[in-house]
């Protein structure tokens, strides 16, 4: 239940940040005025909407980061619950190695290696 509430706030925060960034005026551009930002300078004071929108964007971005951390915590808790359900812990599992093949065919005229090695030996010259 709490995870669903955090997801809803996370999505609302993400959409809000996107909308506020698109509404803000860029340097030397009046794109925000087409959405009403230019006409509402008197509502938000003498400085206009730039400080209001930038502060509100910063607040929404901080909320977005906090909900991201919360969702990460919920994901970690859910992963820990899944390992406790009955699945074996991968760190505890033993890896069984196959026994060395003793029935490898040997060519006539060659003698088998005395000690098995990882690096192949060069044939002896007669």
UniProtKB/Swiss-Prot annotation:
Compositional bias annotation for Low complexity: 112-126
Pfam families: SecG
TM annotation in the entry: 2-22, 55-75
Entry keyword set: Cell inner membrane, Cell membrane, Membrane, Protein transport, Translocation, Transmembrane, Transmembrane helix, Transport
Keyword field contains Cell inner membrane: yes
Localization per Swiss-Prot or TrEMBL: Cell inner membrane
GO CC, any one term: plasma membrane
Highest taxon of the lineage: Bacteria
A GO biological-process term: intracellular protein transmembrane transport
GO molecular-function terms, A-Z: protein-transporting ATPase activity
Membrane topology of this protein: Multi-pass membrane protein
Record has Translocase as a keyword: no
Region: Disordered, residue numbers: 103-126
Biological role: Involved in protein export. Participates in an early event of protein translocation.
UniProt similarity note: Belongs to the SecG family.
Protein name, entry field: Protein-export membrane protein SecG
Organism lineage: Bacteria, Pseudomonadati, Pseudomonadota, Gammaproteobacteria, Pseudomonadales
Gene: secG
